[in-house]
Amino acid sequence: MQRWYAPRLNNIYYPYGCYLRVKINNMGLSLDDMEPIFKVIQALYNRAVTKKNDLDDILYDNKENNKNEEILIRKVLESTKAGIISYTKVQKDILMMNFPNNKPSPYMYCNCEGIDCEKNKPILTYVRKPGMIVSYENYGPWVDGINSTNKEEFIIAIFVLNSNNRLSGIDGNDSLEEYVRKSELADHTSWQDFSFRANNPRIISKIQN
């Protein structure tokens, strides 16, 4: 549950309606119960949607490493803003990987490969309006342009779609949210470009680049 709904669990900053409250075996899952990596994911999501870096959360004391960057695309959207990528560099202690907590690597929590013995590859995830994580990537076009870190730190990032934006130059009045939702196909495990109303605007690949 935390892996897929970290942005929305007990999150008062979730901007699209009610946040999620979860019970497992009649026991409520609070924000304090969440694993550190998923607290980081939620904290990054909140920085993307609020544009504030002084939120009282797991990244509060890591301000100098927390960054937001707007992803701009020309010619295919009414507004050039496709979304915001919020990212940070965190030490092992923030993820509680050191003694006495000894939490596992974020690669394990996110079901990512982490086979490099000398460096840590970045982890990036992406999300649209419902607040459900689609996938965690540490290989491929989402992260190929991001440098790896040493073994004592990790780069964690989330791309938050500008769901209220709309496509331009295509018949109809379709939102960016609708286009991306259809790109997930039935398995909801990735975003893929596709031909939409006899046109392929290549929005996903442009976001990745």
Give the location of each predicted region:
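Bergerat-fold GHKL/Histidine-kinase-like ATPase
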Residues: 1-209
